[in-house]
Protein backbone atom coordinates (compact mmCIF):
# COMPACT_ATOMS: atom_id res chain seq x y z
CA UNK A 1 0.00 0.00 0.00
CA UNK A 2 1.05 3.60 -0.49
CA UNK A 3 2.34 5.43 2.52
CA UNK A 4 0.56 8.53 3.70
CA UNK A 5 2.65 11.68 3.35
CA UNK A 6 3.26 13.95 6.28
CA UNK A 7 1.99 17.50 6.45
CA UNK A 8 5.42 19.12 6.00
CA UNK A 9 5.18 20.73 2.53
CA UNK A 10 1.39 21.03 2.64
CA UNK A 11 1.50 23.09 5.79
CA UNK A 12 3.90 25.59 4.22
CA UNK A 13 1.78 26.06 1.09
CA UNK A 14 -1.42 26.52 3.07
CA UNK A 15 0.28 29.18 5.20
CA UNK A 16 1.15 31.07 2.01
CA UNK A 17 -2.44 30.87 0.82
CA UNK A 18 -3.68 32.24 4.12
CA UNK A 19 -1.35 35.21 3.82
CA UNK A 20 -2.56 35.79 0.24
CA UNK A 21 -6.22 35.78 1.21
CA UNK A 22 -5.61 37.98 4.24
CA UNK A 23 -3.89 40.60 2.09
CA UNK A 24 -6.67 40.41 -0.49
CA UNK A 25 -9.22 41.58 2.07
CA UNK A 26 -7.59 45.01 2.23
CA UNK A 27 -7.51 45.55 -1.53
CA UNK A 28 -9.96 47.68 -3.50
CA UNK A 29 -13.02 45.76 -4.65
CA UNK A 30 -14.24 46.62 -8.16
CA UNK A 31 -17.27 45.15 -9.81
CA UNK A 32 -16.39 43.78 -13.28
CA UNK A 33 -19.42 45.58 -14.72
CA UNK A 34 -18.00 48.91 -13.51
CA UNK A 35 -14.66 48.21 -15.21
CA UNK A 36 -16.36 47.38 -18.52
CA UNK A 37 -18.63 50.41 -18.17
CA UNK A 38 -15.64 52.68 -17.58
CA UNK A 39 -13.95 51.27 -20.69
CA UNK A 40 -17.03 51.84 -22.82
CA UNK A 41 -17.48 55.36 -21.42
CA UNK A 42 -13.83 56.15 -22.19
CA UNK A 43 -14.27 54.89 -25.74
CA UNK A 44 -17.40 56.99 -26.28
CA UNK A 45 -15.65 60.07 -24.85
CA UNK A 46 -12.68 59.58 -27.18
CA UNK A 47 -14.96 59.18 -30.20
CA UNK A 48 -16.92 62.32 -29.20
CA UNK A 49 -13.68 64.32 -28.89
CA UNK A 50 -12.59 62.97 -32.27
CA UNK A 51 -15.83 64.07 -33.92
CA UNK A 52 -15.77 67.46 -32.18
CA UNK A 53 -12.13 68.45 -32.55
CA UNK A 54 -10.77 66.00 -35.14
CA UNK A 55 -7.68 65.20 -33.08
CA UNK A 56 -7.38 61.54 -34.08
CA UNK A 57 -5.89 60.87 -37.53
Curated annotation (Swiss-Prot):
It holds the Pfam family Sec61_beta. The keyword Cell membrane applies. GO terms for cellular component: plasma membrane. It is found in: Cell membrane. The chain crosses the membrane at residues 32-53. Involved in protein export. The function of the beta subunit is unknown, but it may be involved in stabilization of the trimeric complex. Component of the protein translocase complex. Heterotrimer consisting of alpha (SecY), beta (SecG) and gamma (SecE) subunits. Can form oligomers of the heterotrimer. This is Preprotein translocase subunit SecG. It comes from Methanothrix thermoacetophila (strain DSM 6194 / JCM 14653 / NBRC 101360 / PT) (Methanosaeta thermophila).
Amino acid sequence: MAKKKGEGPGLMSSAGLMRYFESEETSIKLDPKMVIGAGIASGVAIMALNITFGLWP
